[in-house]
Amino acid sequence: MQNPVASLLFILAMLTGPCPAADYPERTERTQSAGNHVWHIDPDKGNDGNPGTAPSTAWKSMAPANRLIMARGDTLVIHPGEHAVSLALMGEGSKQAPVTIRFMPGRHIFKHGALMTGKPQISNTNDAPNEPKAMAIRLMEAKNIRLEGKPGATDILLEGKAIFVCMEHAENVSLNGLGFDYLHPTMGEFLVTEVEGDTMKATIPDGTLYTVKDGNLTWHGPGWEFRMGGYSKVFDSASGTFQGRFDPGKTVIRELSPGKISITFKEGSPTMKPGQSYQNRNTRRDCCGFFQYRSKNILWNNCHIYYMHGMGVVSQFCENIMFSHLKIAPRPRSLRTNSSWADNLHFSGCRGKIIVKDCVLGASHDDAVNVHGTHLRIIDRPAPNKITVRFMHPQTFGFDAFAAGDRIDYVSCNTLVPYASNTVSGVKQLNEKEIELTLQHPNPGNIQPDDVVENVTWTPSVHISNTVCRHIPTRGFLLTTRKPVLVERCRFEKTGMPAILVEDDASGWYESGVVRNMTISRNTFIQCGEAVIQIVPHAPRPEGDVHRNITITGNTFDLKNGTAIRIRHTGDVKAEKNTFTKDGKKIPEEKAVDIR
């Protein structure tokens, strides 16, 4: 059962913002469709005064569609062009006759300025909790919905910073054959084309907006700007790795012509080579690419994400999610080398099945896949059967992390070992970071300062297969869940850090999850950061095993240094039938595997 107060607060937050209320009416102000209708939107030739029932009488904007509650068999055909209004969809189809939103081939540009805004509280992203976030497409309390386009031909483009698709309390939703991109990426980039003496010449990708003044370069786009510098990476396309460095503070930048710059070093010599790309971003996590919240049965099929801002596809308290044939990579033949600020696919507090198959992930500044729960610290015990808990990480808070009926584990902050369980019977949100939980049974008597709880009802099984992970300076997959995990037949290419990392902590990111059943089988690891597979929970004073029952079998490791597997505080480990090479020569397992 969902927390009704928290859900209402979330809905109200999603309705706040400067967007015109008439374009985004509430459910009670909408008209119920009888079903089996076809409507058309044509931003170039339409008129919102038209009936919208044929291409020749199409609406101009999404506003008339936003005044409907759609029903089984309804189809909304959206023709390409510039969309000034978000699509805010409510309705319910059936499994046999879903509501279909068909984006016709071409460029669908969602303009900056009048899009629907809200204040969703997003895990690992909440640097700006009170700033309205724009949304191009919003699905709310929608069921049996199909979003579709033509693969390789239908592109949804954002002019300014926004969430592409935000869905909350939705069910049976599929996204098929769609491409997603930014007109003006929030990641500043340039490609070095020439180095001579103390000067580099570089080309800035099309669509990347910038100004040069007084020897400095500023990246900008609709509603945002930042001066070059701060967090950055240098990507070497020839090797597919991140290497090198660049400090713009020691340079003078001049514009030679539109998209062409020179960079002269005031001291020292150029630190980049021709063919290398500089990637530069603001570190403020104020938005994400896609947000899926309290929704279930979500399918992504044959989609391509060319660029998204901030954290990537965030699934928060969702159930049963599948990504099939998803590609996250820059547009072919583009000079861009980055597709995502942070994680590609981020799962926080989900349950059911997470399936990722036949995908290409990467081109990000953080992990390809991250699956975790959240540890909340116990800060008070106001009654024998009550506890007050607090979100501890500054980028994760504000959402309803518990509901009546959820099972919780009490976890030692020092050992990370669960020592008691209970069931939630009531939830009271005290403020954006603190929650009072009423429990069915009294608290255990051995709670220690800084101990935490985890919502173990919301823990998913994970199956990742036939997926390529590349062009990432950090990790490939972070996986912490007690339900079964299977990673098989995947290919990891030159991740900067471990290709697969299993942690669990109650002092840093507070990302929770003991592992109870994990198999890593028949994967290929090429020149990844080491240890390539690292299973090391962050237990300050370990006592016993945090994780257990892990099998690593039949994998192939091409090593840079020699450490393929490092495991700590984990029981029932099997590492067998794996192949290890370094510099083309086989090395024995005892040298490549470190289990203690």
From Swiss-Prot:
SUPFAM superfamilies: Pectin lyase-like. It catalyses: Hydrolysis of terminal, non-reducing branched (1->3)-alpha-D-galactosidic residues, producing free D-galactose; Hydrolysis of terminal, non-reducing alpha-D-galactose residues in alpha-D-galactosides, including galactose oligosaccharides, galactomannans and galactolipids. Its EC number is 3.2.1.n1, 3.2.1.22. Alpha-galactosidase that specifically removes branched alpha-1,3-linked galactose residues present in blood group B antigens. Has no activity toward linear alpha-1,3-linked galactose residues. PbH1 repeats lie at residues 351-373, 482-504, 515-537, 547-569. It comes from Akkermansia muciniphila (strain ATCC BAA-835 / DSM 22959 / JCM 33894 / BCRC 81048 / CCUG 64013 / CIP 107961 / Muc). Keywords: Glycosidase, Hydrolase, Repeat, Signal. The keyword Signal applies. Residues 1-21 form the signal peptide. GO terms for molecular function: alpha-galactosidase activity. This is Alpha-1,3-galactosidase A. Belongs to the glycosyl hydrolase 110 family. A subfamily. Pfam families: Beta-barrel_GLAA-B_II, Beta_helix. Residues 23-57 are annotated as: Disordered. The keyword Repeat applies. It is an enzyme of class 3 (hydrolase).
